[in-house]
């Protein structure tokens, strides 16, 4: 009998399920997969901001500076800072009277 066709019936004033074949390996595997899926879904919903922030910033790291002389590293930092400073000119300053 399939789990999809099981019927819940009142047994001794409690609701129960007549599952005679619950020791079937397929049923056990499906139950374990279902429980693991539920746990992972709950963790994802609770910590989705942290999880996706790690993925987002982890993949957007700058180029590796291993083996690059310090002078070139400083030049690169200055170029990056100048690019950021140039972008600040695009914002409009609004003053309220």
Swiss-Prot record:
The primary gene name is: M
Covalently lipidated residues (S-palmitoyl cysteine) read: 50
This one is known as Matrix protein 2
Chain segments carrying region Disordered: 60-88
Compartment(s) where it occurs, according to its Swiss-Prot or TrEMBL record: Virion membrane; Host apical cell membrane
Which chain positions carry the site (Essential for channel activity, possibly by being protonated during channel activation, and by forming the channel gate and the selective filter)? 37
**Sites marked Seems to be involved in pH gating:** 41
Similarity comment:
Belongs to the influenza viruses matrix protein M2 family.
List the GO terms this entry assigns under cellular component, sorted alphabetically.
Answer: host cell plasma membrane; membrane; virion membrane
Glycosylation is annotated at 20
Composition bias type Basic and acidic residues, residue spans: 71-80
Q: Which organism is it from?
A: Influenza A virus (strain A/USA:Memphis/10/1996 H1N1)
Q: Which domain of life is it from?
A: Viruses
Regulation of activity = The M2 protein from most influenza A strains is inhibited by amantadine and rimantadine, resulting in viral uncoating incapacity. Emergence of amantadine-resistant variants is usually rapid.
Q: Which positions, given as ranges, span the membrane?
A: 23-43
Q: Name one GO molecular function term.
A: proton transmembrane transporter activity
Membrane topology qualifier: Single-pass type III membrane protein
What's the miscellaneous note? When the channel is activated, one or more imidazole moieties of His-37 probably become bi-protonated.
Domain characteristics, as noted in the entry: Cytoplasmic tail plays an important role in virion assembly and morphogenesis.
Virion surface side of membrane: 1-22
Q: Name one GO biological process term.
A: symbiont genome entry into host cell via pore formation in plasma membrane
Intervals, Intravirion compartment = 44-97
The annotated subunit structure for this chain is: Homotetramer; composed of two disulfide-linked dimers held together by non-covalent interactions. May interact with matrix protein 1.
Keywords on record: Disulfide bond, Glycoprotein, Host cell membrane, Host membrane, Host-virus interaction, Hydrogen ion transport, Inhibition of host autophagy by virus, Ion channel, Ion transport, Lipoprotein, Membrane, Palmitate, Phosphoprotein, Signal-anchor, Transmembrane, Transmembrane helix, Transport, Viral ion channel, Virion
Function per UniProt: Forms a proton-selective ion channel that is necessary for the efficient release of the viral genome during virus entry. After attaching to the cell surface, the virion enters the cell by endocytosis. Acidification of the endosome triggers M2 ion channel activity.
Which residues are annotated as modified residue Phosphoserine in the UniProt record? Answer: 64, 93
